[in-house]
Amino acid sequence: MPTVMTAARVRVPPTNEADYLATLRELCQFAEARGQRIWLFRNAKDPQLFTEFSESQTEMSHRAQASRLPEEIKLERRLQSLGTYAPDAWELWSEVSLAAPTEV
């Protein structure tokens, strides 16, 4: 089954950055407990622009789809109050295998 991911761009004002990072760090702990991964990258030319990559094994287990604990929902809402997410932030992407097809 292919891995599923989102690539969410978010603009975070400098005054919110420390809180944004702490909130995402806390959310990562919940994700890791479920076998999910979250990576964060900062744009090299625009220090207020970040991209959150969130990966899970299935669509239904992804943070954009899965039912979650109330604590996680609060953290997600907090993140959305600290930054401005791009409109396509929660589009799901599925992994494409580049392995050579096997002959039968």
Sequence positions of predicted segments:
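Non-catalytic surface loops within mature trypsin-like serine protease
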Residues: V12-P14, S56-T58, S94
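An amphipathic, aromatic/His-enriched active-site/gating alpha helix that lines ligand/cofactor pockets
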Residues: E26-W39, E55-E91
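Short, low-order "capping/linker" segments at domain edges
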Residues: D88-V104
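Short, surface-exposed ligand-recognition loops at beta-strand->loop->(often short) alpha-helix junctions
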Residues: V10-A22
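Active-site-flanking beta-strand signature of metal-NTP-handling nucleotidyl enzymes
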Residues: T3-R11, T51
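Short acidic/glycine-enriched loop/turn segments that link adjacent beta-strands
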Residues: K45-L49
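Long, compositionally biased, intrinsically disordered segments
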Residues: T3, L21, R25, G35-N43, ...
